[in-house]
Curated annotation (Swiss-Prot):
Record's subunit section: Consists of a catalytic RNA component (M1 or rnpB) and a protein subunit.
InterPro entries: Ribosomal_Su5_D2-typ_SF, Ribsml_uS5_D2-typ_fold_subgr, RNase_P, RNase_P_CS
Family, similarity comment: Belongs to the RnpA family.
EC numbers on record: 3.1.26.5
Entry keywords, A to Z: Endonuclease, Hydrolase, Nuclease, RNA-binding, tRNA processing
One GO CC term on file: ribonuclease P complex
GO biological process: tRNA 5'-leader removal
Function: RNaseP catalyzes the removal of the 5'-leader sequence from pre-tRNA to produce the mature 5'-terminus. It can also cleave other RNA substrates such as 4.5S RNA. The protein component plays an auxiliary but essential role in vivo by binding to the 5'-leader sequence and broadening the substrate specificity of the ribozyme.
Catalytic activity: Endonucleolytic cleavage of RNA, removing 5'-extranucleotides from tRNA precursor
One MF term in the entry's GO annotations: ribonuclease P activity
Keyword 4Fe-4S: no
Gene: rnpA
Name this polypeptide is given: Ribonuclease P protein component
């Protein structure tokens, strides 16, 4: 489970991230990111916060919950590498229902990398 300080809970936070943030689409998900320091809020401190949107288009409840659990597990590993004060909303597309956890993680990391929220992985030995 994602710790409470790293969860997006309020509808207004989701809306601000989706409407005012940057967006990067991948095959099975769309990543929205918003830097809280840009907002007129005093709540720009704290670690990154993650929110999930898994609609009925993904599939029945069992499948939607499975996709959400996979994405939450991936987000736990990203808490330490995404910059503090960043809100991230991950919107699952219908293809996420059949994608493996590894594919979802690769797509999420690629989206965050394109949004300049992750440092590129060095391939030097």
């Amino acid at each position: 489970m994602l710790p409470e300080p790293h969860r997006l809970r309020r509808h207004s936070d989701f809306s601000m991230t989706v409407r005012r943030g940057r967006r990067m689409g991948r095959r099975d998900l769309v990543v929205h990111a918003f830097d809280r320091a840009q907002a007129d809020e005093l709540v720009s401190s704290g670690g990154p916060r993650f929110g999930l949107v898994v609609s009925k288009a993904v599939g029945p409840a069992v499948i939607r919950h499975r996709v959400a659990r996979r994405l939450r597990h991936i987000c736990i590993d990203l808490v330490d590498v995404v910059p503090r004060g960043t809100d991230v909303v991950i919107r699952a597309l219908p293809g996420a229902a059949t994608a493996s956890s590894r594919d979802l993680e690769k797509q999420l990391r690629a989206g965050l990398l394109r949004l300049d929220l992750l440092a590129p992985v060095s391939t030097s030995a």
